[in-house]
Each structure stands twice: as C-alpha cells, then as structure tokens.
UniProtKB/Swiss-Prot annotation:
Compartments (UniProt record): Nucleus
GO molecular function, one term: U2 snRNA binding
Entry protein name: U2 small nuclear ribonucleoprotein A'
Swiss-Prot/TrEMBL GO biological process terms: mRNA splicing, via spliceosome
Keyword Repeat: yes
LRR repeat residues: 19-40, 42-63, 64-85, 88-109
Pfam families: LRR_9 (PF14580)
Keyword field contains Nucleus: yes
Gene: LEA1
Length: 246
C-alpha cells in the first residue's frame, strides 16, 4: 500500500504515553516513505513498524519530529541528508531491518540530537566491532540497543577506531571505505520503492557518469552552506541520482 496523501489523511494521530503526538502507520505494507509533507510537521513521533520500507530517506523538512519507529522493515540504506531533513530526531528504532554495512550508519552522525538508537536484529549488529564503531562514529548517542553507553566503552571505542593524532585506525578505515563504494551505487528506485534498473547512457541528450566520492562530498558541503532552498533542492536531486552530466 503506497503512502498516499489520502492514506495519511485518514491515519490515526493521537497523544501517546510520552505525551507526544504520534502518527500511526503500522502494518500497512508501505514500500517507501513519501508524501509526509502533507502532515504539515504536526507530529512528534511517527510509527512505521511492520512495513516494507527499504530506504530510510525521502523525508521533507520535519523540525518537530523526535521519534521514528521503524522496526520490522527491510531498510538497508540511509539517506546521507537525513540529519538535514530531521534535525530534531532524538530516538530511532531500526530493530530487525536489513542494514548490513556499518559504514551506512555514518549518515546518522548528522542527526545531532539522536540519543536513543536501536539496531538489534540487523546484520550490521552482528559485526565484531559493531558497538565500538557506533559509539565512536555517533558520539551523540547515549543509549544503544537499550544499553546505556559507559565512559569506559567510549574510551575503548576511541582506542580501537582512532589513532593518537585523530586519524582512523586501519580497522576503522577498512569499515569506512565501504561508504565510498556504496555511495557510488545509489539506486534511485530503491528510494521510491520501485524495482527498475538503471541503464547507463544518455538522458535528455546528455551523457552522464557516476559521481566520485570527492564530488559527492563537495555536493554535501555545498548543501550545508547553501542558503537558497531552490539550490538545495537541485543539489539534493543530483546527490540522490548519484550521477553528473558531462
């Protein structure tokens, strides 16, 4: 079932036990996050548990949203711009999803207010240095998988992942290099819940090529510094497409 404006308009929104306004979208076989702009940023929490979502992204700017419940979905990728779209995100539940690469979690580092994170049941959570990597790369998180992060864990994570002069260790670098590889393989149709295959070649008479990791970083930096909404939209579209015109 697509997340249409009509579905959103008839979905229940109520005050939960934490006295937050929560939008209930549980168990609707939703394949992709879309059309949330029609909610007019009126919810503190959104419950999308038990759906078929594959990509954590495509959010409009939701400055009010603090809690996202996404357990039991199929999420394997995270939008690099999620911190820009959800600046107030405080609690994120990704239990029993399909995230396999620890490097994918780096995108959550831009969620400055994220303090509660759960990744239990994901392939990534079974990696040997999973907890140390998350603690090191997401220092704002205070509770991981329902366990409070202790100071000694932070110290161990830093020793394991960072050299004395502040550079990633060989272990950390090996994990992070997968981020560049995955960034080169963005599938736009995964973002919108479709199953089409990209065919390289020409678009509107222009040839295109994949963005390099350096070009993606430059675009992300340009988005961060831009003050024009139109420019941000254009840059984000290029980033999501993963291609540039030549």
């Amino acid at each position: 079932m697509k997340l249409t404006p009509e579905l959103l308009s008839r979905s229940s929104s109520s005050i939960n036990t934490l006295r937050d306004r929560e939008l209930d979208l549980r168990g609707l076989k939703i394949p992709a996050i879309e059309n949330l702009g029609v909610t007019r940023d009126q919810n503190d929490a959104i419950d999308l548990t038990d759906n078929d979502i594959r990509y954590l992204g495509n959010f409009p700017l939701l400055q009010q949203l603090k809690t996202l419940q996404l357990a039991n979905n199929l999420i394997s990728r995270i939008d690099p711009r999620i911190g820009h779209s959800l600046p107030a995100l405080h609690s994120l539940n990704l239990t029993n999803n399909c995230i396999s690469d620890l490097s994918e979690l780096v995108h959550l580092s831009k969620c400055r207010r994220l303090e509660y994170l759960c990744l239990m049941g994901t392939p990534a959570s079974r990696e040997a240095q999973y907890r140390e990597f998350v603690i090191w790369k997401l220092p704002q998180v205070r509770v991981l998988d329902y366990q409070r992060i202790k100071d000694k864990e932070r110290a161990r994570a830093k020793d394991l992942m960072e050299t004395e002069d502040g550079r990633p260790t060989a272990l950390a670098a090996n994990i992070l290099k997968k981020l560049g590889a995955s960034a080169m393989d963005v599938d736009v149709d995964v973002m919108v819940g479709k199953q089409k295959t990209f065919e390289p070649g020409r678009l509107n008479g222009s040839s295109r090529r994949l963005l390099t990791a350096e070009e993606r970083k430059a675009i992300e930096d340009a988005i961060e510094s831009s003050e024009s909404l139109e420019e941000i939209r254009k840059l984000e579209e290029q980033l999501k497409m993963g291609h540039t015109f030549v």
